[in-house]
Structures are given as C-alpha cells and as structure tokens.
Amino acid sequence: MPKTFFITTAIDYTNSPPHIGHAYEKVLADVIARYRRLKGDKVFFLTGVDQHGQKVQQSAAKAGVPPAEFVKEITQKFVDLWEKLDVKYDEWAETTSERHKKVVQGILQRLFDAGQIYKDKQTGYYSVRQEQFLTDKERGPDGQFGPEWGQVEFREEENYYFKLSQHKEWLLQYLDNRKDAVIPDFRQTELRNAVEKLGGDLCISRPKSRLDWGIELPFDKDFVNYVWFDALTNYISFAGYDPSQSTLSSQPSTFRDKWPALQIIGKDILVPAHGIYWLIMLHAIGFPDDQMPQLLVHGWWNLGGAKMSKSAGNIVDPFVIVDKYGAEPVRLYLTGAIATGEDADFSEERLLRYYNTWLANGLGNLVSRTLSMVHRYLGGRLSRIQSKQSTKLASSWLNSIEQGVLTGETFSYSEDFDETPYDKVFSLPKFQVHKAVGLIIETIAKCDRAIEESAPWQLAKDPTNAEELARILYNLTEVIRVIAIWISPVMPKTAHGIFDQLNWKMELSEKEERFSLADAEWGRLPDGHVVGKPKPLFPRIETDKGV
C-alpha cells in the first residue's frame, strides 16, 4: 500500500496577525498538496499555530488580556485567512492542546532519562528575538551580533540544556550522505556551513519566575519548556507519534504511514531551528537517517527590496489584497511570480498586471472566445475529427503548438504522464511550482497565437473548410479542458468554473470535486459533446480602480 504524502508548513507564531509571507508559504504547500492529490496520492497536510512563548506572554500583557485569550483571537485570524485563500489542510496544530502537551513532555522525559538533558547555569549574551543565549561563534567579522539576532542583552540564568553538540558529527555526515536533505541545494550548503560552526548545547527551558506561558517540564515543575521542543514537535505530535515507543518501527501505523514529511519553511528558520535543532532532536529520539524529513526552503516576499516587518511599517495585509483581487488571482501570483527558494518583491502593480494579462485577457478570454466560436460556427456541438495527415502521437503537444497548427496530433502527448512537462516541474526533487504556472501561462499564450494564425472566422466562410474548422475548435476546447486540470492545484474554483462552461464532468475521479491528472489525457471530450454558454471568468480591472 502506497505511503501517504505528508506535507507540513511552519506553524505561525500568534503574537501578531498574519502577513503576506504567511499566506505565500501556506498557499505553496496547498498547491503541492493538491498536485499530489491530482496524481492520485493520499495526502496529509498539516499546518497550525505556535501559541506559547515569551513574545506571546508579553503581547498579551500589553493588550491587557490573559495569554490564552490573546492567542485565541490571533489564531482565529490565521484560520480565517486560510479559509479565505482556500487552503485545505487535513490537520490543524495548536500547541496549547493536551494532545501536543503529552507528546512534548513524553519526549523531554525520555531525553532526560537518557542523560541528553542536564541542568546548568549560564551567563552571557541573550537574543530576545531568537530566545536563546549566543556564543562568540554567532558574532560577525566585526565582533558584533548580526541583525538576525535582534535585541541582544546580557543575562545570567539557571536552565536545562539539551546535548546538541554531541550530535554535530552525525549531522555533518547525514548532510554529506543525503544531497537532497534541503531544497534548493544552495540552502543545504548554507546549513552545512552553519553546522561546522556549531559549538555549545541548546537551552530548552525557562524558569516560571520569568515565563509561565508554556508546557511544564515533566521533571521540574519550576520550569517550562523552551520554544524548540514545543513548536518543532508539532510535526510529529499531530501526526500520531507516540513518545512511549522508542523505535520508529514500534510507532502506531497511522504515524508510520505518513512519516517522513516534506517540510516547507522560510529561509529565516532553516538555521538553526529546523536544519540543526529539529534534525538533531529527531536523531536523539531514535529516528534513522532514512526517516529524516526533507526541508523545502522558500524565500521572502520583500517590499521595495526590503524585508517586510511590523516595525518598518511595510507589511502587506493579505486580507485586503484578497478582498480586492480575489483568492485565486492572489494564489496564482504568489506561486507564479516567485521562484521556489528565491526572494521576490511584492508589487500590487505587478499583481494587477498578472490579473489583467494572464487571467482577464488570457485564460478568461481564451475560454470565452473559444466557446463563443463553438456556438457560432458549430451550434455548440463538438465534432471529433481525426487528422488525415498522421496517426503518430507527439510526445509533447506543447512543443508542437509553437507552429500554430491545431491538429489532433499537435494536442496529443505521451501516455506516460511522468514525461509531460507539467508533471516534471511539479515532481521531486525541485518543486518548481512557478515553472508549472509559467507552463500554463505559456500554453494560454500559444493558444491565442494559434487562433490568430488559423483564423476560424475565415474558415467558416467556406463550407469546404467545415472539417478543418471543426477539428480546430475541438482541439481548442480540449486544450482548455486540459489547462483547467493543470491549473486546478493553483486555482481550483477557476477549474470548476471552466468545467461548468464546458459542460464536462471528470470521468476518472473518485468524487466530482476531486481532480485527477489522468483526466488530462487527450481526447476525453466525446464526439457530439455539447458545450455550455461562455460566462466571464475574470472581468478586467481598470488600472485606476485596482491600485
């Protein structure tokens, strides 16, 4: 039985409402999850919120409300945004849940009993942002701590520590042996360089006298767990992990069926959180090398070349953007206008151009124009006419359409979907979602050029061209159907809207609302199929109204 495709995102910290960067990560994960469902895979998509920690306690105090009440309100904002953006997760993680607390405490007790956790006093410089003590290894060439550490202050405190440094050589060897542990590969190089500099152990507690909003240590009631063993553990606690079982083979089948996961994170939490702390934590509790998660690291959406931040006042509110342009155009822009793993500048002007160029004038116009011609010249009924020229199928109709010749052969492709360009760009190991979006956009543009070159309106003037006209309009309608399936992971409601206008229901899907890549096989629109009437999919937005 095939394993479940398990995909996670970072859980979002509930000290402030979501911004466009949160939206990008979740939409990216949702698109990949939908693509795997499209291929017929069973998928488990986990996301959620991190509700504990010093910043939450401070923000709640500033707001004059208890932490539990504060995080409940912020949590709801994230839930509302994912609903608004049509992000369909299978499990929701909240770190205040009892289920999660039991797993965290179980893991901590196991590590404490194994001598992996010890108590010690520490004096030194402390990063308020990263909530950790720093060493000289974190200093830059100028001897100062870099801006990534935020406010740094001198502290003395007794706490519990995890023997992180003991596992340094293991992590280096693991990264050397597995070349795709981190995607893209330059991030793996970045991680390995950071591991080389790894020195001390990891503080995993805070005294309750300073922080009481957290999970109590099972072996010392005067301390709460520090953020890492709380936040990072969600990836397994909400997937069914049992901390009482010391080996992976003895875990419940519900967990073994899912693990390992593809974990989508931002570049700012690769080092040290996920690339060092998380991988070493898993190794310490018995996860073998071949069961380590794969880390897909995305870049940032900047604004005017600068990182978005509340303090700089340059945050893009995703609620406002979605209300203005719609969820599906925003999903298309967020996944199409940034290369996976790289940074990009968020621009509302560019989003508007995306909408008008590729949706209003592109896909929407292609559907409307084609179906209007089918009704005008064929009475709304398609005729599937085989080409007289050749019966040999092209391996990729995308390469042939460049010529602007719309024949049955041009729009056919290999029966092996692993050989189609669409499937390649979505599949392991790169997850190049932006290239899949680009392929769809390119196909729409080629269809428009092909219509102009074949000029169905001219063919319709001569009855002797009836077969050629019918063949062209069938192929155009069929490629629109294929595009709808291709675009469904990014724009599911748009895909359904196109199917409604085509008057077509998916044949191979288990449920009507579930798309199947097998349905993209060429020629599924039968001879004599009657299409629906065209309706505007994306009304054009005038520039002065959009921005």
Predicted segment positions?
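Conserved, charged catalytic cores of large soluble enzymes
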Residues: 1-14, 31-204, 241, 245-254, ...
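Basic, alpha-helical terminal appendages of large translation-related enzymes
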Residues: 1-4, 18, 44, 48, ...
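Structured secondary-structure scaffolds
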Residues: 2-40, 44-47, 99-103, 147-376, ...
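Active-site rim elements
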Residues: 94, 264-268, 469-470
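A glycine-rich phosphate-binding loop feature that marks nucleotide/adenosyl-phosphate handling sites
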Residues: 125-130, 297-300, 349-350, 384-391, ...
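Extended, non-catalytic structural segments that build the interaction scaffolds
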Residues: 159, 345-359, 400-408, 413, ...
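Helix-loop segments that flank and shape redox-cofactor active sites
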Residues: 255-264, 426-431, 456-459
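Amphipathic alpha-helical segments within well-ordered protein domains
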Residues: 319, 423, 484-485
